[in-house]
């Protein structure tokens, strides 16, 4: 059977136009900031105005073709609601199945499962800062829960399903201080802006439950840091991983307003969004054992 050369050319042109249109389509991003636990100033609405972080994201979206939806309403989560987004960003806290601190509508158990299914099915997911302080294993109920001794344990495959999807979990933080982080993969989208090392004032989370397939992007240098919580081996602050068919990206930074103002943080976040949404490609091979072999050895619990 012979193909008509004109039809072949026409088909190629149409395919090219289709692919160009697809690549030119804005990434549809949900920025979800319900705080059932501690409510950070960068996500708080004051006098009905957008939050600090929402204003930063709005400016980024205008320059980089992102279609943003801002929400604190957990009751909206369903397969149909999540289907309209390419990337879901969580800057959240606490047990989102409870109304909690910000008094915004809670998620349902079915809504939480819809999120997990959406990511496993191919949606991009991004966790920022207290996105790792969300759905702690064995901690139910709203409010800013006290730090409990149980957080200083790795639960592995018994950890909450959300934590297993994210690839890590918040334990506690010490006093804000200037600290250094070593960049592991400068070729990953957004990381080139950091150079080979990041050094800033921030609230540095201690973390656990690192997944075996985490691809660490930068690692906190704990040597010389002040406070008992940092008397442990270096561990990742940011990573990328796959979860089912989905791409997951996390960055523990983002507590302070000046971090959100920092062009390096913005470039890093944009790279994460574009990678998670499939606009940019990069390998996310597991490397945590090689670059942070002691990461899952936790600090000693001290009340």
Residue ranges and their predicted role:
Residues 23, 28-32, 37-135:
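Helical hinge/lid and interdomain linker segments adjacent to catalytic or ligand-binding clefts
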Residues 158-160, 164-244:
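Catalytic beta-strand/loop cores that center a nucleophilic Ser/Cys/Thr
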């Amino acid at each position: 059977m012979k193909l008509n050369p004109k039809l072949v050319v026409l088909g190629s042109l149409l395919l090219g136009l289709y692919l160009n249109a697809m690549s030119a389509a804005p990434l549809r991003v949900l920025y979800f900031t319900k705080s059932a636990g501690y409510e950070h100033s960068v996500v708080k609405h004051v006098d009905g105005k957008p939050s600090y972080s929402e204003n930063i994201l709005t400016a980024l979206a205008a320059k980089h073709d992102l279609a943003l939806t801002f929400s604190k309403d957990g009751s909206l989560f369903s397969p149909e609601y999540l289907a309209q987004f390419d990337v879901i960003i969580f800057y959240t806290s606490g047990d989102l199945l409870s109304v909690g601190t910000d008094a915004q509508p809670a998620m349902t158990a079915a809504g939480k499962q819809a999120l997990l299914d959406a990511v496993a099915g191919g949606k991009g997911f991004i966790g920022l800062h207290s996105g790792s302080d969300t759905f702690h294993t064995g901690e139910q109920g709203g409010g800013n829960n006290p730090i409990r001794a149980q957080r200083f344990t790795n639960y592995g495959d018994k950890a909450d399903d959300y934590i297993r999807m994210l690839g890590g979990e918040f334990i506690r933080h010490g006093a804000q201080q200037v600290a250094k982080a070593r960049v592991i993969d400068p070729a990953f989208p957004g990381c080139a802006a950091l150079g080979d090392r990041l050094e800033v004032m921030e609230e540095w989370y201690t973390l656990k439950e690192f997944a075996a397939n985490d691809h660490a992007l930068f690692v906190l240098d704990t040597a010389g840091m002040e406070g008992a919580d940092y008397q442990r081996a270096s561990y990742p602050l940011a990573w990328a991983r796959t979860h089912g068919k989905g791409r997951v990206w996390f960055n523990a930074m983002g507590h302070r307003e000046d971090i959100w103002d920092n062009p390096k943080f913005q470039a890093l976040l944009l790279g994460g969004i574009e990678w998670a949404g499939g606009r940019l490609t990069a390998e996310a091979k597991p490397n945590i054992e090689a670059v942070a072999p002691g990461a899952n050895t936790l600090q000693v619990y001290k009340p």
